[in-house]
Amino acid sequence: MMSTKAFTLVPAIEREQLLSDRDRGLLECVECCGRNLYVGTSDCFVYHFLLEEKTLPGGSATFTATRQLHRHLGFKKAVSELRAASALSRLLVLCDGCISLVHMLSLEPVPSGARIKGATAFALNENPVSGDPFCVEVCIISVKRRTIQVFLVYEDRVQIVREVSTPEQPLAVAVDGHFLCLALTTQYIILNYSTGAAQDLFPFCSEERRPIVKRIGRQEFLLAGPGGLGMFATVAGISQRAPVRWSENVIGAAVCFPYVVALDDEFITVHSMLDQQQKQTLPFKEGHILQDFEGRVIVATSKGVYILVPLPLEKRIQDLLASHRVEEALVLAKGARRNIPKEKFQVMYRRILLQAGFIQFAQLQFLKAKELFRSGQLDVRELISLYPLLLPTSSSFTRSHPPLHEFADLNQLTQGDQDKVAKCKRFLMSYLNEVRSTEVANGYKEDIDTALLKLYAEADHDSLLDLLVTENFCLLPDSAAWLEKHKKYFALGLLYHYNHQDAAAVQLWVSIVNGDIQDSTRSDLYEYIVDFLTYSTDPDLVWRHADWVLQRSQEVGVQVFTKRPLDEQQSGFNPDDIISCLKKYPQALVKYLEHLVTERRLQKEEYHTHLAVLYLDEVLQQRPCTPDKDAEVTETQAKLRRLLQESDLYRVHFLMDRTRGAGLPLESAILHGKLEQHEEALHILVHELADFPAAEDYCLWRSEGRDPPYRQRLFHLLLAVYLGPGPAAPARTVAAVDLLNRHAVEFDAAQVLQLLPGTWSVQLLRPFLMGAMRDSIHARRTTQVAVGLARSENLIYKYDKMKLKGSSVRLSDEKLCQMCQNPFLEPVFVRYPNGGLVHTHCAASRHTEPSSPSAGART
């Protein structure tokens, strides 16, 4: 149990003020309405006092009660109960089983003498159902056995509206709307007097203890339960709050949210409704009354009246926060919302939320702290300032005053516990990352992002790079020094780049690759630099580092030129300048020329020739000293052959001279082909290389896109070379037969038969002859079909002509042009297929056909 000072007990009326020495009456009941305090005594007097509250300089409250009037009610018994009906200016007084109406100020009975007889106890309905503002609803326990009566009380009259029977004799009652909460002889029940429905709550023994039934809010009651428990119950018969444990012999109870105040023979105890713990105990002997009136709790003995004054709200809240009782402080603050002006409450509550947030933060309850910080709209710099050196040196931030917490910095908060420090830093990283893109960060994004960068760098966190490659507001001087301190040189380069200092960034990265400084963030940093330069829009930066990237790797380094976006290649980088730069780097030069020729397809003879020469030089370097025609073709040689075949821009004669005597027969054959020297090319392929498939491919390659006679001439040349004199005649004969049989359609069969030796059998040339015959028959039949179609078309035209000649056209001076509606002045006209006649000049100016074939008539 934790001790809390929630209330102070302040005297309001001493016996000397209440009764004179000769008076023998004792205080029996109390009522308070605003400043009006009423006391009923055992000798049937009612006293009226005016209460005045004063606050002393120290903050404590005092009360002064000024006695106004007192009146004897004319009975011999004690005044049992008093209830004020301020709307009617009436005081309801229960004495000797009768409820009388007296004026609140004069204490005079109403002239009509209206009263309610036969009552043992009564309660006012603070949630009335009648809807009449000029009356109050009163529920009484009748002297009739097991009977409850409901009355409407007006200024000068009373009216009974309902009488309800109960299962047992009622001892105490509280009312809310249509619902009665009753203490019966053996149990508590909820009774709806409108419908008669009853709900049992729990058993109660009236012989052992005094019943307590208090309405504490809308449709909720506080009851004295078994086992010394203060029980809460709703009109639905359920409890939405846990019970509080108080004394077994409680005399009275009241609620002053969030506290339950109870009175027994010796003490006043205060329990929290939030955690059900006892918070305060006040010694108070001989007390027999404890009631709350509009939030004011009054206790009384038979000789005096005292007021339980709650400590000032903010002091209570601050005391709770100082005791780290966050939930109680927040609930207490919320409960005061109705009593404080809205703007003042919002300022106060926001500050309480933030204080609570820092308490939870200090206890490492980060989720709760984060929610409180959000609700309180924390200036996140308050949190950052706890972490030494995280705020930028240029920050103008000063902590809130009065302070929101008691800590100088994180080291004091954690008492040097490095594990706690690490947890706090992880929380701040997470929190800053969440709020940096929200409205919370507006106005001090630089402080947030700079702090976040420092945390990431210190923790070697992967998100450091993500922060720097996206939009951020990291301050360069602070951030650069921090990154350098923690040897985050790659990240420092990203920071330079974000601040448009690309030269500094690249120079830093180059130093890492060269080993001048150590940073293992990226194992592929060289490739990253190449990629960075590739997309850089600063030509000077690229040229400045071109030699460095090429020296480390020609194949990778040349990408700063070859992978550059096309628009930048055309604007800031002249190919001739790049070629001049790459002369020292032959591999890179080849890659760049390949890029120009094959990817960009630049139609410039110089580039094509240069690339071919470089290919040729490399092929010659790779060739063995003794050429072997069966040697495997290298990748470079394949590229050379492909370039020689596909390009028409290189200098053929120049390359022919370079290949002459170089032992490159296939390349020479391709060059001869480019010069239309087909016999020489085929001679090389057939006689020197004996590469018959290559010879056939040559014919197909050179005849691609040309007319059929050209293609036929090439194949006839190849056949002639096969059949001509020379070495390897048998092999050439087989090749000739294969050529004819595979490409029969490419030959003129009549010419071929004249060239073939007479010793060749028909069976040998069967595929060729069949193909030739099929082609001849196909050609003849195709011609016949074409002739037939032409004749049919001609016949159709003749038929149309005869139809036109078969009908006559009569032209007279009464005929009108269907375009201009004027007569024809000469026998010259245009006739449309629909029969319409128009002037020739009208037809020339208008290309539309007349809508009607009928001749116009003069009117």
UniProtKB/Swiss-Prot annotation:
GO terms under biological process: autophagy; endosomal vesicle fusion; intracellular protein transport
Ranges of the CHCR repeats in the UniProt entry: 563-727
Keyword Cytoplasm found: yes
CNH domain ranges (all copies): 24-297
Compartments where located: Cytoplasm; Early endosome
Pfam families: CNH, Vps39_1, zf-Vps39_C
Keyword annotations: Cytoplasm, Endosome, Protein transport, Transport
InterPro entries xref list: Clathrin_H-chain/VPS_repeat (IPR000547), CNH_dom (IPR001180), Vam6/VPS39/TRAP1 (IPR032914), VPS39/TGF_beta_rcpt-assoc_1 (IPR019452), VPS39/TGFA1_Znf (IPR019453)
Entry's Gene Ontology cellular component terms: cytoplasm; early endosome; membrane
Highest taxon of the lineage: Eukaryota
Keyword Cytoplasm on entry: yes
Family of the protein in this entry: Belongs to the TRAP1 family.
Protein name stated in the entry: Transforming growth factor-beta receptor-associated protein 1
Gene (name only): TGFBRAP1
